[in-house]
Amino acid sequence: MQTKRWSFILLCNFLILSSYAEDFRLTAFHPAINGFSQGEKPLIRSQKDASDNQGIYKMWGDIEYKGDPWVRNISRPNTITHGLYNRHIALWASHGRFYNAKTGAWEWQRPNLFGTNEDLFTQTIVVPYLIPMLQNAGAVVFTPRERDWQKNEIIVDNDGNTDASVYTETTAKDIWRSTNTRGFAQHTGAYANGENPFEAGTARMTKTTTKERNTSEIVYRPQIPEAGRYVVYVSYQTVAGSISDAQYTIFHKGQKTVFKVNQQMGGGTWVYLGTFDFDRGCNPYNQVVLSNKSSQHGVVTGDAVRFGGGMGNIQRGGDVSNLPRSLEGARYYAQWAGAPYSVYNTKGGEDDYGDDINARSNMVNWLAGGSVFVPSLEGKGVPLELSLAVHSDAGFAENGTSLVGSLAICTTDYNDGRLNTNISRMISRDFADALLSDVTRDIRQTYHDWARRDLLDRNYSETRNPEIPSAILETMSHQNFPDMLRGQDPNFRFTLARSIYKTILRFITTQHGQSYTVEPLAPTDFAIAFVGKNKIKLSWTAVQDSLEPTASPTSYNVYMATGTGGFNNGRRTKRPSLTLELEPGVHYRFKVTAVNRGGESFPTEVLSAVYRSNTAKTILVVNGFHRLSGPTVINTEFEQGFDLNRDAGVSEGLTAGWAGAQQCFDKSCMGIEGPGGLGFGGDEMAGRFVMGNTFDYVATHTEAIASVARYNVVSCSSRAIESGKVQIGTYPCVDLILGLEKFTPSALRFYKTFTPKMQKILRAYTQKHGRLMVSGAYLGSDQTNTNGERFLAEVLKVKFSGTNRLDTLPYIKGMEQEFEIYQALNDKHYAAIAPDILEPLTPAYCALRYQNEQSAGVAYDGSDYKCFTMAFPFECIRSPKVRNDIMRGILTYLLK
């Protein structure tokens, strides 16, 4: 009896110690707990750690989601086995516009500083960089703020469409009928607090089929008001018999991409499929088709499909925000997405600020409830397993030169230190520590300096409320100029986002005891050349990531578009080159991504080719516009800040990051909040999207050349020329695109119109009777040293004579044309705000003039070579017809 009693006691002690084991294994890694000084090495460090799983506790244990992903793109040419495929992540940028009941006005949650505010700035990290990186690794990403920087919104639905959009049902065998649950329906005008659009209408359903002849479809054909990029959201109802492979086909500019959606989860809300280019109008080349064809026996349901992020439509205090929905807080998106009233209205309708904070994590729990990761809460069954809030915060260095840097936040002391699955909340601390350590390491190794701040364990809503591992990353101080000097540079934001993506990858795979591979960087030295009568060879060079040994590419995806159509879904090739045959007279466009087991890189620049005939001359178009940068920097003894009016910088594609021009530059006002404080600025740009560098301007040039119908055309990156890969001497004519390229002292990357190497190459080309066309906004102002001025004079036959503000002088004339260029910030094309004045040097002459008669274009018709130099970017000419006519005139002049 005594032996049995002691055996029972020993068993109890063993169970108690076992219950503490997971906490012990975690706390051993935490400096604040084990007594070590706070270091900078996170728990997860290397591929070896992840693959061998030595010394690392697999926190999820046997908890694993084994079903189909919520959404999967089956048109993707590559397979992801060591990335984030079938991982579901919740992620958001901080804050957003909200209604302040105390003031009776819509306001930002954070002040305008250095041209932006936190509500806008953190989106420029998350939307163009972090979310795509995670998706390229195979993850399904949910964000409780609208992700689409698009003001238009078109809804196609069985209960009513936007404008002239068309909803059509076709039936082969089983008819479409209404579900027993409510569905989406829209109405015109604003929505009152508490109105749920997903309770206002109906949804449709039919039985599935495995046979093509029995296929029934719903066609959602939008009336697109203007050509552009639009997000595509679908909706449906999860019912008894729902399938996990509902097939949606998106037709976008003539191409089609097929998705499988798991309708066994996530019904009754907007489900993101992707973002695509659509043409203006209503036609079968731009639509979404839902099919009942499935490998499973059950039912498929269909409800509204939404194209575009749209404008905010939730009324508070008698008015809507009058801003794009993407700039609003999560509280209002949650209502539009069909979330229950309790998710976004936690303060009785009296405090939208508090509601917005809570809505972010409440949406996570609402979606994840009922999944393996949040099993005891009622919800939509989406297996979200990680939550991250990306913020910036306040604080400044009094010396005006030091960095404030990053900090991370977690919450472990809540619900007895347990998450919904009963695993320890210390897992969130490991995640926060890894984020902070990796960001510090990656930024220091890339840009030499960064400040690591604290790892805080605090009671914050965004880390307390989620029932899955969570963290807040305060990326930097938006109040500290040295921090924002880096933060406003798109290259820095890419590095920051890539570090966060890599941490998420390491963390999730390690917690499941799996190995990982980091997705590659984009290839470089992209070039196209003819290698036969109508054959071209595309070639590029892999880029190795010095920070990540696993990030090497093992293959590549080559994407192609023809005419005005969209890009296809890609063709995989193992070699860094591909040979193709071209059809005569067709305008081709190409871009390339690098691929490995972990995912896919961002794409290269877009290059183009046109084959006319075997006897036609071949023109080489060169892209030399690679610049990404923040605005003009002012940093003197007495002043600091950014001058958006002089140069707003160059974002990567579209940006929503600007609030307004900085007004106070006085360093003595550092730390003052509001008007009169250093960095304070206006709100005149709020709600405006601004286009930056889309890296596809070669196509604008080649399209204009193709309109002449006399020449073959190929293209390359200027980097391929400088590396020696492309020899321009074999081409009778070269068209060099320089856009907004220029050297900027404060930039984190080096850019230059004509580097010494490029000067040497172009000089040699003209000495051998080459024909050269060059266009760009800063050709002269970027070459003000002795060697640069000599190159301008001796090769281009021009002299820099100042700049021209085109906001008051919008027209350019010459070559029997009078035309406008993009000269003001806009959401369609980058703007040449203040291009150079380039005066001709004898015997060259002025061929184009600004409205004030200053020289805008110079032609040199020598017996040795010919050259045509434009002081503004050719691709900034607004009218396609004018571009074609100007290009025809230039080529006739150069090749006569």
Walk through the language-model features, giving the residues of each:
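Pro/Thr/Ser/Gly-rich low-complexity, intrinsically disordered linker/stalk tracts
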Residues: 507-550, 584, 598-617
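Active-site microenvironments of hydrolase-like enzyme catalytic domains
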Residues: 327-425, 457-479
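Beta-strand-rich modules
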Residues: 579-600
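Aromatic-Pro/Gly-enriched surface loop or interdomain linker
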Residues: 114, 118, 129-137, 145-146, ...
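A glycine-rich, often tryptophan-bearing local segment used as a flexible ligand/cofactor-contacting loop or short
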Residues: 740-846, 851-852, 882, 886
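Short beta-strand-plus-loop segments that form exposed binding edges in beta-rich domains
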Residues: 288-299
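Short alpha-beta junction capping motif
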Residues: 619-625, 632-644, 724-786, 861, ...
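Active-site-adjacent mobile loop/cap segments within catalytic or ligand-binding domains
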Residues: 304-312, 371, 386, 392-399, ...
